[in-house]
């Protein structure tokens, strides 16, 4: 596939990235919660994961997003291994705040945002990734209290001064929290939920007004916008999308896509697949057309998925007219 790489500024950091990143949650594999419940995206294969990362690189992707808690450290290890000698040509974004047993047991515990923990988590991520710096370090606790977040930012400023990180971000869907660190020069991005079926106008307005990157998790609505799900579909056994968790809006507790989401997708499918795009590529194109600050980070498990996602960069964003038509069809 011809490499065509759209570029985006990573907020006010001076760092430039491809207009889409590669999300590395799924490739970490599952974790085991304290009550014994397994939580993940179903079966994974490390060789497939490495191939997906390498294919993303070949297709022009330069941003790779992970978290220390994904697979209880495994995602970071796989990403570092896959990048290898190409590490200095890419931007690594990882997260901290959710604790786990770093011993191979994949045991996952609660949150911790104490200054001591943030410092130790950063060093552990550097070790797992096999790098001497993290390009974008992200607070992973979306609802952390403001006073605690201020203490976290003080530590992030310290890590920035040491050279352990280059910039930092808060992963949150709360606009007031997204604005909390505006006075800090190292703060350059907000990671938040965004896809064609779930707009986030207030957060996008904040990012545009303050010159922050809008890093978009869930750009394919947890895989729903791949188009492979029908009313008779179910996610695979062991997949958290069948857990009934409140924030899994698209799928019900049996792992089936909800009827109202299928109807919304049918309403906009023709626009998203215009001009030779696949549905996935159209969903990413909507995000780019929504704001010049956006950088979607669709997750992958295979090289084919990475290639299809990156192929969206050959088509570019939807037009303002198409964006407006979608808004009308979805009644917003």
Question: What is the role of each PLM region?
Answer:
Residues 34-43, 106-112, 313:
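Short glycine-enriched, charge-decorated loop/helix-capping segments at active-site entrances
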Residues 26-29, 70, 98-102, 140-143, ...:
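Feature marks short, surface-exposed loop/turn motifs that line or immediately flank catalytic pockets
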